Curated annotation (Swiss-Prot):
This is Fructose-1,6-bisphosphatase class 1. It is an enzyme of class 3 (hydrolase). It comes from the Bacteria. One of its GO terms (cellular component) is cytosol. The lineage of its organism: Bacteria, Pseudomonadati, Pseudomonadota, Betaproteobacteria, Burkholderiales. The keyword Hydrolase applies. It comes from Burkholderia lata (strain ATCC 17760 / DSM 23089 / LMG 22485 / NCIMB 9086 / R18194 / 383). Keywords: Carbohydrate metabolism, Cytoplasm, Hydrolase, Magnesium, Metal-binding.
């Protein structure tokens, strides 16, 4: 690709702003700041043990999960990058119990930013791809945010994206007008458009699920996975392969590129907890991206983006990816209702 012909993230967003007239300047600037923060996170991740940021921090987040040093650092990078720009009313993060209002000494904007600063952090110390997930909403109360301001269904998202820190660092984005992927050119520090209008194949022969939990699954999930595992001898009449990275951004990025279905269901171990993944900053942004790429995303019983949130850290079951497979496993759940 000729350097002169490259489309950077900034150029892409400005062109989108001109062509669609539905990408406000403040939203464009906010996306650029998030992308810049992801570059800083990528740099710290890539240093590994040389940066003395591996290992646990000796603390837990609001979910009771042990925090890694890079979890905390990534959270601080996103907060520091976004608090002063005047585009946001408030932020919320997996790593914080309550929301983060923009300090009074900085101007406030009309948007809310919600993020998982470092998804898949159990993989940090073993050099497996991890990432950042984010979602942008409008603040319904103008520039004065409360926790209730964040509790909007995913259909109200105005932008969502993720970064993957792997062999390449990529930034995947939707503003409701398709899905595009940008690759970080480390030599010049720019995000360069490398995939346009990404589309998930409707059919697939790959699935992603943590099979070690099989004994705890409810019947619809067991039925679906058993059919896949039966291969050509089973009711599907075809062989399927399982892929599981234990990093949602990595699994979803693979599905976005070559199809597949990602499943993180509720199970019998914790019947009072509907799933593990968080709605606001994991399931909703990924569902927005997947749907914009022609896929589907459900809880097994309803479209994820139509779930009305009741809390910042609410959890939901997740089934997303190639539409025909998501429709099938969703149908099995609906039969049991």
């Amino acid at each position: 690709m000729s350097i002169a012909r490259r489309t950077t993230l900034s150029k892409f967003l400005i062109e989108q702003q001109r062509e669609t007239n539905n990408l406000p300047a403040d939203l464009r600037l906010l996306i650029e700041v998030v992308a810049r923060a992801c570059k800083a996170i990528s740099y710290n991740v890539s240093k590994g043990a040389l940066g003395e940021a591996l290992g646990t921090a000796g603390s837990e987040n609001v979910q009771g999960e042990v925090q890694k040093k890079l979890d905390i650092l990534s959270n601080e990078i996103l907060l520091d990058a976004n608090e002063w720009g005047g585009n946001l009313a408030a932020m919320a993060s997996e790593e914080m119990e309550t929301f983060f209002p923009i300090p009074a000494n900085y101007p406030r904007g009309e948007y809310l930013l919600v993020f998982d600063p470092l998804d898949g952090s159990s993989n940090i110390d073993v050099n497996v791809s991890i990432g950042t997930i984010f979602s942008v909403l409008r603040c319904p109360d103008g520039k004065q945010a409360t926790e209730e301001s964040f509790l909007q269904p995913g259909t109200q998202q105005v932008a969502a994206g993720y970064a993957v820190y792997g062999p390449q660092t990529v930034f995947v984005l939707t503003t409701g007008n398709g899905v595009n992927c940008f690759t970080l050119d480390r030599e010049v520090g720019s995000w360069v458009l490398t995939q346009s209008n990404m589309q998930i194949p409707a059919d697939t022969r790959e699935y992603a699920i943590n099979a070690s939990n099989a004994r705890h699954w409810y019947d619809p999930v067991k039925r679906y996975v058993d059919e896949l595992n039966a291969g050509k001898d089973g009711p599907r009449g075809d062989n399927f392969n399982m892929r599981w990275i234990a990093s949602m951004v990595s699994d979803v990025h693979r599905i976005l590129n070559r199809g597949g279905v990602f499943m993180y269901p509720a199970d019998k171990r914790t019947p009072d907890r509907p799933g593990k993944l968080r709605l606001m900053y994991e399931a909703n942004p990924m569902s927005f991206i997947v749907e914009q790429a022609g896929g589907a995303a459900t809880t097994g019983t309803q479209r994820i983006m139509e779930v009305q949130p009741t809390g910042l850290h609410q959890r939901v079951p997740v089934f997303l990816g190639s539409k025909n497979e998501v429709d099938r496993v969703t149908g099995y759940h609906q039969e049991k209702q």
